[in-house]
Regions:
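Conserved long alpha-helical elements within nucleotide-processing catalytic cores of c-di-GMP signaling
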Residues: 2, 7-30, 37-67, 73-77, ...
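Catalytic-core segments of nucleotide cyclases and related cyclic-nucleotide turnover enzymes
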Residues: 48, 85, 89, 93-100, ...
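Short, low-complexity segments with poor structural confidence in diverse proteins
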Residues: 181-183, 187-189
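Short, intrinsically disordered C-terminal tails of secreted or membrane-associated proteins
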Residues: 198-199
Length: 200
């Protein structure tokens, strides 16, 4: 009833049960909202099986990166929930930085589909009159702020890669119109892994 078969995490029903708990959360409670990026792009370019694998990888990596005493569940689709107990704002920031480092390390094994996500959190200690649902709504709003920031960072990185490609072609004293074939071997995030150029 409470298991998400695709990821092995607690499912939406369990997440909703925890969020609807009328008991006021303890002051040390934190709620984190995670949202995967680029799932639609992966589904469209590589197929839904690749998208499902992307979700599973994130779920496994997130659960492994979080201490066992913290709850991690899937609220649906590409969205996940974590409920923490104990960390203050600084400690939770450090924990989320640790999670990001662990997921970046996991992504090195999958250069074509590195894990990209946004996260926001809210603490009961900062919102003493809030219930669990209120904390989740605040965390979700903060997640969307982070999502816009992540998208801007990825767009800037994409532009830098395009500029590097242009510099490489210029160093060869060629232009794109000279190329008989150019294989940049771009992954779904337009990251250049290797290149081969053949010119007329």
């Amino acid at each position: 009833v409470y298991l998400d078969a695709a990821t092995g995490l607690p499912n939406k029903n369990k997440c909703e049960e925890l969020l609807d708990d009328p008991t006021p959360p303890a002051p040390e409670t934190g709620v984190c909202s995670f949202d995967l990026n680029n799932l639609r792009r992966i589904n469209n370019s590589m197929g839904h099986e690749a998208g499902d694998a992307y979700i599973r990888r994130f779920a496994v990596a997130l659960r492994a990166a979080m201490p066992e005493e913290h709850f991690v569940g899937r609220t649906g689709g590409d969205e996940f929930l974590a409920i923490t107990h104990g960390p203050d704002a600084d400690a939770l920031q450090k924990l989320l930085s640790h999670v990001r480092k662990q997921l970046a390390e996991e992504s090195r094994q999958h250069p074509d589909t590195p894990l990209s996500y946004a996260v926001g959190f809210a603490l009961a200690s900062d919102n003493p009159d809030s219930n669990m649902r209120d904390l989740f709504d605040l965390a979700d709003k903060n997640m969307y702020i982070n999502k816009n920031h992540v998208k801007r960072e990825e767009a800037a990185a994409e532009k830098r890669l395009d500029f590097q490609l242009l510099k490489q072609v210029n160093r060869l004293h060629r232009s794109f119109s000279d190329c008989l074939y150019y294989d940049a071997r771009l992954d779904t995030y337009r990251s250049i892994r290797a290149c081969e150029s053949f010119f007329l």
